[in-house]
Amino acid sequence: MASSKLLSLALFLVLLTHANSATETSFNFPNFHTDDKLILQGDATISSKGQLRLTGVTPNGDPRVDSMGRAFYSDPIQIKDSNNVASFNTNFTFIIRTKNQSISAYGLAFALVRVNSPPQKKQEFLGIFNTNNPEPNARTVAVVFNTFKNRIDFDKNFIKPYVNENCDFHKYNGEKTDVQITYDSSNNDLRVFLHFTVSQVKCSVSATVHLEKEVDEWVSVGFSPTSGLTEDTTETHDVLSWSFSSKFRNKLSNILLNNIL
């Protein structure tokens, strides 16, 4: 028995050392500046107010038709390392504003995509997908704040959601909105909590996601929205703040530690 515990302890220490070699990431943007570690694509810019303005506006401040912009953290994020899978937590605040409160398009995605991936199709594809059919090579997982269908979607490798929950973006148009997204790798649990801060209305949704099967070892994390094809359906997408942290926890090492104890 003693020798078995010693062997488990030795294996635990080896795995712990390996876990510590994985890259964990943490950053915080209480507001945004042009020299921040961000990759801006399409129509994305940093506004004079320190906001991440993801889709275009006209000279008078109205949302621009058929606009798409993407913003990703410039350093790749490690999601998996051998038996190790990262958990993560991200918080951000956004405002989506449309001219027509009864209908708008298309929404904002928070996405984990392939490193150095170029922008994809506009409109309902949100700049992260190319087709309505499964794309195994897309290696993308996204939480979509779907303003066209008034819901929160979970998308894996194509635009059709495998989980969704109603959330009335039209009713709370223009409100500052706080979001927390968490992923717990110990039970493959992806959760979204959304709070319209003026109306005090909340939405939430969760699902089981085996992230290590859906994305690459290293990913880029960030935002990708698109606006509608007519002036009546366009909207602006501004992110006011964003923080992110990832942490590795080795499932096998936890089992060995329980055996030692």
Swiss-Prot record:
InterPro entries: ConA-like_dom_sf, L-lectin, Lectin_LegA_CS, Legume_lectin_dom, Leguminous_Lectin
GO molecular-function terms, A-Z: carbohydrate binding; nutrient reservoir activity; toxin activity
Signal sequence region: 1-21
Key words, A-Z: Disulfide bond, Glycoprotein, Lectin, Plant defense, Seed storage protein, Signal, Storage protein, Toxin
Alphabetical GO biological process terms: defense response
Disulfide-bonded cysteines: C167-C203
Glycosylated residue positions: N91, N100
Described purpose of this protein according to its UniProt entry: Seed storage. This carbohydrate-binding lectin has toxic effects on bean bruchid pests.
The protein's assembly and partners: Monomer.
Family affiliation: Belongs to the leguminous lectin family.
Protein's recorded name: Arcelin-5B
Provenance organism: Phaseolus vulgaris (Kidney bean)
Originating gene: ARC5B
